[in-house]
Amino acid sequence: IPDKEAKTKAMELMKRVGLEDQLAKKTGKYSRGMRQRLGLADVLIKNPEIIILDEPTSGIDPAGVQEFIELIRWLSKEEGLTVLFSSHHLDQVQKVCDRVGLFSNGQLLALIDMAELKDKKQELSDIYNHYFEEGGERHE
């Protein structure tokens, strides 16, 4: 990518992740949430079809978590980016994901369609409790 084009794209991504007003600040002064968004911009500059996020909100303050979740949801729903989102926070998973895999010791216990849960007026936590607290039957 030519320098001018790279700079333009970088500026666009910084704006997209909400850091355009932080450009003069050294990255060492960024909060954990800001660093997560900067890392996301770094990945997005490569135009991926899929991104893998492993516990992306860990260490981020509650306000920053909500902001980051909204950004991920926007990338997935509006931009059509495939996001593999690994988290122990069911509320975050429910906001971001279309399908959820429940794993234990590296084994898939269930693959859940979030639209189906909504139709049944169930919460992801109900399914989670079924498998992990009640010893529910595994679906392989």
Regions found by a protein language model. Give the residues of each.
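Helical segment within the ABC ATPase nucleotide-binding domain
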Residues: 66-78
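Catalytic Walker B motif of ABC-type/P-loop ATPase nucleotide-binding domains
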Residues: 51-54
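Conserved H-loop
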Residues: 80-86
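Conserved catalytic motifs of ABC-family nucleotide-binding domains
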Residues: 47
